[in-house]
A protein has these predicted regions:
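Short, surface-exposed secondary-structure edge patches
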Residues: 162, 312-317
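Short alpha-helix capping/helix-loop boundary micro-motifs
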Residues: 157-158, 308-313
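Core beta-strand residues in small-molecule sensory/regulatory alpha/beta domains
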Residues: 60, 305-309
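Short, solvent-exposed mixed-charge patches
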Residues: 355-356
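SH3/SH3-like beta-barrel superfamily modules
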Residues: 317-351
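Lumenal/extracellular ectodomains and adaptor appendage modules
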Residues: 1-293
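A short, compositionally biased
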Residues: 49-56, 299-302, 331-334
């Protein structure tokens, strides 16, 4: 993989890849893109519950939209749930409430039902059932897949497609999807490397002005980076951009990050060893956030000067053949804003070559 550009914002994840086949022969292989495990219980999903495909996955190869396959498997705290249980779902991305699960479970064969009962994959208990006429919920007994603690079922969804890589040529692959979020009721971050009571987090989430509320972690997502280890060698140029309405925190490369509107990473010859997590901080849900401008990944044709303003003070130098994120929608004249963490400013468009 020559280049990867990963752009994460509330409501959408976009990934662009540039692949190169350096051999003398075409290579045809299956490409797999797994999502982080999610609960099979309805209320663990985002608020896109009525969508046929909540994740809205789309795939393009060399600019043309392509078909793909969707598979899923079920686990209960790390142990596989028998594969026949997947018949309970009509399609991989379907989410079920407990009452529907109970009805679908009863439609299994007696032997299949007994296997799940004997294996303690399910239990008999009380569920909340919505009365659609009154709008009120009441308790009802039935077979449950999870009590949120001891018998939680997780669903692992994977998208796949067959890809041919021509010899000595490059191809671009792009896919987008709506990630699954956890909504945080306590306001404490889910990311494991962020300590909510630490001085660093308390200072970062403090009110910006007197009378304002402290920022709280509202929505949490995960992204699997380590699948890149399946490709030959490291990623030539890995580029990450996280955009949030106000601030975000999370874990990258096993360490914490604290970011304002943008968090940008550019790593040459990168082999990810840990996955990524993000908590978006705000005083309300961020799922409706829509950015005004689309970011672009550039390769520097330089060296190029980075200025505080167009024609302003020189802040530093962008080295030749390095990669940076920019926002051409906000350019002033021929000067494009650079969206790096501690190295932001303006660069002249003549020194920037668009990659994705």
């Amino acid at each position: 993989m020559r280049t990867e550009a990963l752009y994460i914002r509330p409501g959408q994840i976009e990934v662009n890849y540039l692949f190169e086949n350096t051999t003398d022969n075409p290579i045809t292989t299956a490409v797999f893109f797994p999502l982080p495990p999610i609960s099979a219980v309805l209320d663990y999903y985002t608020d896109y519950l009525d969508a046929t495909h909540q994740f809205r996955f789309k795939l393009w190869v060399n600019g043309k939209e392509q078909p793909y396959q969707t598979q899923f498997s079920l686990q209960q705290h790390g142990r596989p749930v028998p594969s026949f249980a997947s018949k309970i779902w009509k399609y991989p991305e379907e989410s079920l409430d407990e009452a529907t699960f109970h009805q679908r479970f009863l439609a299994l064969s007696p032997a299949e039902r007994q296997t799940l009962i004997d294996g303690k994959y399910i239990y008999w208990g009380y569920m909340l059932v919505l009365n659609k006429q009154t709008g009120e919920s009441g308790e009802q007994e039935g077979w449950l897949m999870s009590d949120r603690h001891d018998t939680l079922w997780e669903k692992q969804i994977t998208y796949s497609w067959e890809q041919t890589f021509p010899p000595h040529k490059t191809i671009t692959v792009r896919h987008t999807y709506t990630p699954s979020y956890k909504t945080i009721n306590t306001g404490a971050p889910f990311s494991k490397c962020i300590e909510g009571n630490s001085p660093a987090y308390q200072l970062f989430s403090a009110p910006a002005a007197q009378g304002e509320k402290r920022l709280a972690a509202q929505n949490y997502l995960e992204y699997i980076l380590t699948t890149a280890q399946n490709w030959q060698g490291p990623i030539g140029h890995f580029n990450l951009l996280i955009e949030s309405p106000l601030k975000s925190v999370g874990c990258f490369d096993g360490g914490p990050f604290y970011a304002k509107q943008f968090y940008a990473i550019n790593r040459p010859n990168y082999t990810p060893e840990r996955d990524l997590s993000v908590d978006f901080l705000d005083n309300k849900s961020v799922l409706g956030y829509q950015p005004k401008y689309a970011p672009v990944l550039y390769r520097v044709n330089g060296p190029a000067k980075l200025r505080s303003t167009p024609h302003g003070k020189t802040l530093g130098q962008l080295e030749n053949n390095t990669y940076i994120w920019g926002c051409p929608g906000k350019k002033q004249g021929k000067w494009i804003p650079v969206l790096q963490n501690q190295f932001s400013g303006y660069a002249h468009q003549k020194n920037l070559i668009q990659v994705f």
